[in-house]
């Protein structure tokens, strides 16, 4: 979803003349929506199973990353305007963008507690979910829509920060927060702390030069996931 939103913003930059940053939110929303639609179509025949959705998402992320790299390699001067945003940065976030994103986030996060039962039962497996009367396909689609909207809103504000979204739930689980709502709350808080820490390091480590928070979080996250893989293999 974040890669689709990023590609939508970059494509808008090439199509809209002049100062196109006012179209950032609509372009990112369209990119995220198109990405979500493709994932739903690709995984629909399998009953929207997590594995099929994961594979479809990985394939789309790879495709969008390749297209973004091609646009960067083209040498177009317009890419320089948005290169920092693609790297995941708070530098270009304006007060109006933060306010708009904050309002959307509050509305979406208010829906999360209503889905607590779904998120508690789904990890137990499809058979268990059906046994308690849960409709698997509509439930998975609804949760995917909610997650996609939350991801797109964050991406349009500060750019793609995939590793923060990957690290935070694992860290929260390692801290002992395994029940659904405590895990979600702690994941959000942990992700915020990681972002603030990466942003602070990016501004201070090579001062007066600045490193985007997305690059630093990836630098931190890659060794962390290697550590997790080694730990699980043992």
Task: Name every feature range the model reports, one short phrase each.
Residues 1-234:
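Alpha-helical transmembrane segments in inner-membrane proteins
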